[in-house]
Amino acid sequence: MSKVIKKRVETSPRPTASSDSLQTCAGVIEYAKSISKSNAKCIEYVTLNASQYANCSSISIKLTDSLSSQMTSTFIMLEGETKLYKNKSKQDRSDGYFLKIKVTAASPMLYQLLEAVYGNIKHKERIPNSLHSLSVETITEKTFKDESIFINKLNGAMVEYVSTGESSILRSIEGELESLSKRERQLAKAIITPVVFYRSGTETKITFALKKLIIDREVVANVIGLSGDSERVSMTENVEEDLARNLGLVDIDDEYDEDSDKEKPIFNV
């Protein structure tokens, strides 16, 4: 097992937003714009349709003609500090795990989706009757929490382990959940798709499902070095064996109890 000390690489400060601003329609749109590296127009318009659930509206995205002609999907790519958690309160359910992504970069699809949805609500167009009473001025927006997006719809997703100069390993995430939950937070990319627009009173959010997680297959651990500084140590000798045996995984609190949140949790969709 190799133990290669890697010095931390200083990165430029990431955009930040106050919790209050992220709970307004204008604030969440501006934040999503700030983490987008492009303003290329992707979305022509969005339609919210009534669903079988009173509080949920399905989301239909119409891409620009140029993107539609290329058969472009409506998936959204994110990048950020990523951690898979066990959900203590739901261990016997299909959503026994969830992904937390502290987003540092996002496709312009994200801000344009938010912009289109709340533009529809503001102008009372392309929305079901159940949303006509909403005002963008009084909505408490919950898509982001602590600058993070939480995803508990993981079924059917794939995980791709990547390493520079080597072939990637692609697997169904169902068989990787336990080992991934034991990893420390690390930078990763995620491809997600919007599921529904959810409303509870004046609280609203767009919920997402994971389609693919792209993560470095090297397992690292944070240790306190001889100098007293925190260092990242590679614990990977053979990637295939490590993935199977969960080597190099540190003992951390890898469980998160949503019920311990002081705020009343918004409906998980």
Swiss-Prot record:
Chief subcellular location: host cell
GO MF annotations, alphabetized: single-stranded DNA binding
Annotated compartments: Host cytoplasm
Keywords carried by this UniProt record: DNA condensation, DNA-binding, Early protein, Host cytoplasm
Entry's induction text: Expressed in the early phase of the viral replicative cycle.
One Pfam family from the record: Pox_I3
InterPro entries the UniProt entry points to: Poxvirus_I3_ssDNA-bd
GO CC field: host cell cytoplasm
A biological-process GO annotation: chromosome condensation
Function field: Plays an essential role in viral DNA replication. Binds to ssDNA with high affinity and localizes to cytoplasmic factories where nascent viral genomes accumulate. May disrupt loops, hairpins and other secondary structures present on ssDNA to reduce and eliminate pausing of viral DNA polymerase at specific sites during elongation.
Additional observations: This protein is synthesized in the early as well as at the intermediate time of infection.
Family note: Belongs to the orthopoxvirus OPG079 family.
Subunit organization: Homoomultimer (Potential). Interacts with the small subunit of ribonucleotide reductase. Interacts with host FAM111A; this interaction protomtes OPG079 degradation through autophagy.
This protein's name: Protein OPG079
